[in-house]
Amino acid sequence: MASRDFLRVFGAGEGAGPPGDAGAGQPDDDELSLGLSLGGRFGTDAKRPRLARSSSIASVCSVSSLHADPSPAAPLPLLRTTSLPTETEEERWRRREMQSRRRLEARRKRVERRNSMGSVSVAPADAVSGRRSNASQGSNSASTTEQGIGGSMFNQSADAKSPSTSDNRNQNDMLPPTKAAEKPLNGTATEQQPRLRTLGSLTTRTGSTSDIRKLMMEDMPMVSSKVEGPNARRIDGFLYRYKKGEDVRIVCVCHGSFLTPAEFVKHAGGGDVPNPLRHIVVNPAPFS
């Protein structure tokens, strides 16, 4: 292309035109800035239209708007961004009124429930008093029949029934009124079961108590005084448990005081003796 223009300018021929026609399609001035000006390639040519500036900020105006209308535009009102709708005063008052109504309704229900529970507790009290009167009548009738059978058997059964009667009453108090009213005639059958349980518990309790007594007698044996004289008397006590290096102490049964062997003999009326341990007798354990 350059060789063709060169031949057209410097070559001879009919098609060759004036030198001014060759640069008609080229720009008037050569581009020497290489696009490094503020406006880029288009900043050097004032005749060419400028590019409109695009901005994401609404308050910044573009170049075209500045040329069109120099007066500043009115600022737009900022919209409230929220995930919940704005609550008016009427809605707030309505919501508070509904909450107060719910509280009053819950309080009324609690009062009604409390009153109903009080009335129910009064009714079982009357039923319990009726059951106790029936139980007393049944025990009186049973005692009359046992008196006709024999006096000795009555005494033994009365001693055995005394703990079972209280257990039976406690069990009847814990039963609901419907079950107690349905079975008023089975008093004898209900009395036998607590009696068996009571005897078993008494047996285990007696066994454990006897074991405790044996251990206590082994650790602290019973002693008594053996004194001669006009003011002599027998004083019982038990040897208090002591460790090695401690003084021997005897607990007097009549007063519960801790005494030394000499004081124990003097308390029995023996006076001052040279060897008080000879006047103290250790009693054998009754459970051995």
UniProtKB/Swiss-Prot annotation:
Family under the similarity heading: Belongs to the Ninja family.
Write down what this protein is called.
Ninja-family protein 6
Give compartment(s): Nucleus
Q: Tell me the domain of life.
A: Eukaryota
Task: Report keywords, A-Z.
Answer: Nucleus
Instruction: Indicate yes or no for the key word Hydrolase.
Output: no
Primary residence: nucleus
